[in-house]
A protein has these predicted regions:
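Conserved acetyl-CoA binding element of GNAT-fold acetyltransferases
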Residues: 77-90, 267-279
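An N-terminal, globular interaction/scaffold subdomain
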Residues: 41-43, 49, 63-76, 111
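Amide-forming acyltransferase catalytic core, primarily the GNAT-like/NAT-type
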Residues: 5-8, 12-55, 134-266
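Extreme N-terminal starter segment of soluble prokaryotic enzymes
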Residues: 1-3
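Conserved GNAT-family N-acetyltransferase fold
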Residues: 51, 61-63, 81, 86, ...
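Conserved acetyl-CoA-binding loop-helix of GNAT-fold acetyltransferases
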Residues: 88-108, 280-293
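Active-site/acyl-donor-binding loops of N-acyltransferases
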Residues: 112-168, 224-225, 234-240, 247-248, ...
């Protein structure tokens, strides 16, 4: 018999250092994620943050949830959960454990859930159980500034995957002689690795998307990352470690007055612009070359249509080549109906758990 157990903030605290946790064959959450989930300003004391599936005393699977809020134009707020992690042990496949975890989450969050960054097989499962509808995907552009064949080729053919270390050596050999093609602007900017009053005062006055990120959420994102550059979580299948990782705000000024800011993450030379607030989006586009050069960025991924259009129009960022793809979203039928047919979702690149991975 499969039993589903849910952990809220209080129950999750100290879980990764408990004796029970140490006995698991696989880790259902990392230490950093535990701390971050508990600190989430949008998680209530009653929210279930981690669902565990047991058969007897044996852990068979888990589902991690990131609580959030979304608001209609009239101000009505709906509390919901983003799916963050879902795993079932290979030893226990075929017992409908994933479905049981999904139904437990659906009940705990009153049918209000969303999912992104899922595999095709997971998409099939989510659709099969009948709880979810597809949302319009976000179109993405990945800009390559250096040779990154070790990232591109292994996904195309197994022969490249087997020889990945040699392809990586080729990348390292050729990249020093490949120049950055973009020209840096003369815009005045500063970098903030920590939340400050200037950012708080500026962002709290800006127009937000329906998830209405405020200074509390942005401070949390900066202060409680999920990735460590020191150690990897043992027996954990999701992101917990990166050889290099930074997150920071870029602040742009005119006449010493803050006019634009955007939140960046750089993981292993891969730049993402997670959130931005700007009076003129072209300022972000022309400031990016300086960030790309100063942080030795190899590639950049942007899911924001407006920013991608500005980059294409302004030609401020010049790439060796580009790849086009999309990010899919699922929403429970219940939440979709509550928000209404005319609701504009307008997800930022960092919404969901994307700011942390």
């Amino acid at each position: 018999v499969i039993e589903i157990v849910g952990l809220n903030k209080k129950q999750l605290k100290g879980f990764t250092t408990s004796q029970a946790f140490k006995k698991f064959e696989f880790a259902p959450i990392s230490e950093l994620r535990e701390v971050s989930h508990i600190a989430n300003p949008r998680a209530t004391d009653d929210d279930t943050l981690l669902f565990l599936a047991y058969e007897g005393e044996e852990l068979t699977g888990y589902l991690g949830i990131l609580p959030d809020d979304i608001a209609k134009p009239n101000g009505e707020v709906f509390h919901f959960g983003w799916f963050s992690t879902l795993y079932v042990s290979e030893k226990h496949r075929g017992k409908q454990i994933a479905q049981k975890l999904l139904y437990a989450a659906e009940a705990a969050y009153n049918g209000r859930m969303m999912i992104t960054e899922f595999t095709d097989s997971a998409h099939g499962l989510y659709k099969k159980i009948g709880l979810f509808d597809d949302l319009e995907p976000k179109q993405a552009v990945r800009y390559y500034f250096k040779s990154n064949l070790a990232e591109i080729l292994p996904a195309k053919k197994e022969v490249f995957n087997r020889n990945k270390k040699w392809i990586l050596r080729f990348d390292k050999l050729i990249n020093p002689v490949i120049p950055y093609l973009s020209k840096s602007s003369k815009l005045s900017y500063s970098i903030a690795y920590h939340w400050d009053d200037e950012l708080k005062n500026f962002i709290d006055k800006q127009t937000k998307n329906p998830l209405h990120r405020s200074s509390k959420e942005f401070e949390w994102i900066l202060k409680y990352p999920w990735l460590s550059t020191q150690k990897e979580q043992a027996n954990y299948l999701f992101s917990s470690y990166s050889t290099s990782y930074q997150m920071f705000w870029v602040k742009l000024y005119e006449n010493e007055i803050l006019t634009t800011c955007f939140l960046c993450s750089i993981r292993n030379s891969h730049l993402k612009v997670l959130y931005y607030f700007a009076d003129d989006i072209s300022k972000i586009a022309i400031s990016l070359p300086a960030i790309i050069k100063n942080y030795k960025v190899k590639m950049m991924t942007i899911y924001d249509d407006q920013l991608n259009e500005e980059l294409a129009k302004g030609q401020s960022v010049k790439a060796l080549y580009k790849r086009y793809f999309k990010r899919n979203y699922l929403i429970t039928k219940t939440l979709k109906q509550e928000l209404g047919a005319d609701f504009h979702y307008e997800f930022a690149d960092g919404d969901g758990d994307f700011s942390f991975t």
